[in-house]
């Protein structure tokens, strides 16, 4: 019986380890007026992983980040066409490398200075 429990625990931990995303995003060096390597996003807020709120959210979502110095965008929506009618961003415009978390968290971001 103890052997079965040990196998169950080992299998569960292995599954969790494989399913937990590990993100390696380094500092972005794109100019602040272009977004050639990522996606343009309108984010409600942004900050670094040292920010307690962002660190807590990353922890709750089991998102492991390593050596990230770029900004993290929170609650972002993609901006598809710059200057098109109806497109506006009243919050923060960011260019982000990694949006694998349905817009809730975007990683590897830099601020973009454009008027939408």
UniProtKB/Swiss-Prot annotation:
The keyword Glycoprotein applies. Keywords: Cell wall, Disulfide bond, Glycoprotein, Secreted, Signal. Induction: Expression is increased by carbon source limitation. Glycans are attached at residues 44, 100. Disulfide bonds join 35-95, 42-89, 43-76, 96-109. Residues 1-19 form the signal peptide. InterPro entries: Hydrophobin. It is found in: Secreted; Secreted, Cell wall. One of its GO terms (cellular component) is extracellular region. Aerial growth, conidiation, and dispersal of filamentous fungi in the environment rely upon a capability of their secreting small amphipathic proteins called hydrophobins (HPBs) with low sequence identity. Class I can self-assemble into an outermost layer of rodlet bundles on aerial cell surfaces, conferring cellular hydrophobicity that supports fungal growth, development and dispersal; whereas Class II form highly ordered films at water-air interfaces through intermolecular interactions but contribute nothing to the rodlet structure. Self-assembles to form functional amyloid fibrils called rodlets. Self-assembly into fibrillar rodlets occurs spontaneously at hydrophobic:hydrophilic interfaces and the rodlets further associate laterally to form amphipathic monolayers. Belongs to the fungal hydrophobin family. This is Class I hydrophobin 1. It comes from Pleurotus ostreatus (strain PC15) (Oyster mushroom). The gene is vmh1.
